[in-house]
Amino acid sequence: MSGAGEALAPGPVGPQRVAEAGGGQLGSTAQGKCDKDNTEKDITQATNSHFTHGEMQDQSIWGNPSDGELIRTQPQRLPQLQTSAQVPSGEEIGKIKNGHTGLSNGNGIHHGAKHGSADNRKLSAPVSQKMHRKIQSSLSVNSDISKKSKVNAVFSQKTGSSPEDCCVHCILACLFCEFLTLCNIVLGQASCGICTSEACCCCCGDEMGDDCNCPCDMDCGIMDACCESSDCLEICMECCGICFPS
């Protein structure tokens, strides 16, 4: 009976059995709640990591402001990489072949200034003509200045009196048989010192005495004969033309 009683030991009866059944249900409920909490925790961590990554990107775009400063700039969009190269159209190739150049923006729209070789030639021709005219004008001005300086130098040399001019006047006076004029010039300049006033009076006076020691022994008749000849006059005219070309 004892063995049968042990084998057939009845379980808890009544409230104790109900409590054990209730304890099993509570354990399963607690385990489900724990699993739910773990799932929500994983979702929260993933969301926080996503937000942290986004904030880091925004911070790289906005910059790194120091604490206490307000952000006053707008975020900029990251540049998009262009994977496809722009292929020029037929019109653009024709413009490039014709010598037209242009500038293009990011959208491929060309804003070009058309400058060909013909335009360059047209612009260079007036510039070269202007430079040539300036050079010619400067050369003409320089030549005029040099001519004026030469004329002034010659004029200053002619206007100045020198002993050579006196000698020329004396020679011309002799050739034109102006003996008195010659004597006056000699007396005025006193360049030779040979003929004096007394000697000239002695030589040219009406009365010529034997006691007159005249160093310039001249015959007035020879002078008169010289004045009458045409050869002497021609020589005088040639001398005048050489000495006084004006």
From Swiss-Prot:
<dbReference type="GO" id="GO:0030957">
    <property type="term" value="F:Tat protein binding"/>
</dbReference>
<dbReference type="GO" id="GO:0045893">
    <property type="term" value="P:positive regulation of DNA-templated transcription"/>
</dbReference>
<dbReference type="GO" id="GO:0050434">
    <property type="term" value="P:positive regulation of viral transcription"/>
</dbReference>
<comment type="subunit">
    <text>(Microbial infection) Interacts (via C-terminus) with HIV-1 Tat and Rev.</text>
</comment>
<comment type="similarity">
    <text>Belongs to the MDFI family.</text>
</comment>
<dbReference type="GO" id="GO:0030111">
    <property type="term" value="P:regulation of Wnt signaling pathway"/>
</dbReference>
<comment type="function">
    <text>Required to control the activity of various transcription factors through their sequestration in the cytoplasm. Retains nuclear Zic proteins ZIC1, ZIC2 and ZIC3 in the cytoplasm and inhibits their transcriptional activation. Modulates the expression from cellular promoters. Binds to the axin complex, resulting in an increase in the level of free beta-catenin. Affects axin regulation of the WNT and JNK signaling pathways. Involved in the development of lymphatic vessel valves.</text>
</comment>
<feature type="compositionally biased region" description="Polar residues">
    <location>
        <begin position="44"/>
        <end position="63"/>
    </location>
</feature>
<keyword id="KW-0804">Transcription</keyword>
<dbReference type="GO" id="GO:0005737">
    <property type="term" value="C:cytoplasm"/>
</dbReference>
<keyword id="KW-0963">Cytoplasm</keyword>
<feature type="compositionally biased region" description="Basic and acidic residues">
    <location>
        <begin position="33"/>
        <end position="43"/>
    </location>
</feature>
<feature type="region of interest" description="Disordered">
    <location>
        <begin position="1"/>
        <end position="71"/>
    </location>
</feature>
<protein>
    <recommendedName>
        <fullName>MyoD family inhibitor domain-containing protein</fullName>
    </recommendedName>
</protein>
<dbReference type="GO" id="GO:0005730">
    <property type="term" value="C:nucleolus"/>
</dbReference>
<feature type="modified residue" description="Phosphoserine">
    <location>
        <position position="143"/>
    </location>
</feature>
<keyword id="KW-0597">Phosphoprotein</keyword>
<dbReference type="GO" id="GO:0045892">
    <property type="term" value="P:negative regulation of DNA-templated transcription"/>
</dbReference>
<keyword id="KW-0225">Disease variant</keyword>
<dbReference type="GO" id="GO:0005886">
    <property type="term" value="C:plasma membrane"/>
</dbReference>
<keyword id="KW-0964">Secreted</keyword>
<dbReference type="GO" id="GO:0005634">
    <property type="term" value="C:nucleus"/>
</dbReference>
<keyword id="KW-0805">Transcription regulation</keyword>
<dbReference type="InterPro" id="IPR026134">
    <property type="entry name" value="MDFI/MDFIC"/>
</dbReference>
<dbReference type="GO" id="GO:0046328">
    <property type="term" value="P:regulation of JNK cascade"/>
</dbReference>
<feature type="modified residue" description="Phosphoserine">
    <location>
        <position position="128"/>
    </location>
</feature>
<dbReference type="GO" id="GO:0042308">
    <property type="term" value="P:negative regulation of protein import into nucleus"/>
</dbReference>
<comment type="function">
    <text>(Microbial infection) Modulates the expression from viral promoters. Down-regulates Tat-dependent transcription of the human immunodeficiency virus type 1 (HIV-1) LTR by interacting with HIV-1 Tat and Rev and impairing their nuclear import, probably by rendering the NLS domains inaccessible to importin-beta. Also stimulates activation of human T-cell leukemia virus type I (HTLV-I) LTR.</text>
</comment>
<feature type="modified residue" description="Phosphoserine">
    <location>
        <position position="140"/>
    </location>
</feature>
<dbReference type="Pfam" id="PF15316">
    <property type="entry name" value="MDFI"/>
</dbReference>
<dbReference type="GO" id="GO:0030332">
    <property type="term" value="F:cyclin binding"/>
</dbReference>
<feature type="domain" description="MDFI">
    <location>
        <begin position="74"/>
        <end position="246"/>
    </location>
</feature>
<dbReference type="GO" id="GO:0005576">
    <property type="term" value="C:extracellular region"/>
</dbReference>
<dbReference type="GO" id="GO:0140297">
    <property type="term" value="F:DNA-binding transcription factor binding"/>
</dbReference>
<comment type="subunit">
    <text>Interacts with HAND1; the interaction sequesters HAND1 into the nucleolus and inhibits its activity. Interacts (via C-terminus) with ZIC2. Interacts (via C-terminus) with AXIN1, the histidine-rich region of CCNT1/cyclin-T and weakly with LEF1. Interacts with CCNT2. Interacts with GATA2. Interacts (via C-terminus) with Piezo channel composed of PIEZO1 or PIEZO2; the interaction prolongs Piezo channel inactivation.</text>
</comment>
<keyword id="KW-0945">Host-virus interaction</keyword>
<keyword id="KW-0539">Nucleus</keyword>
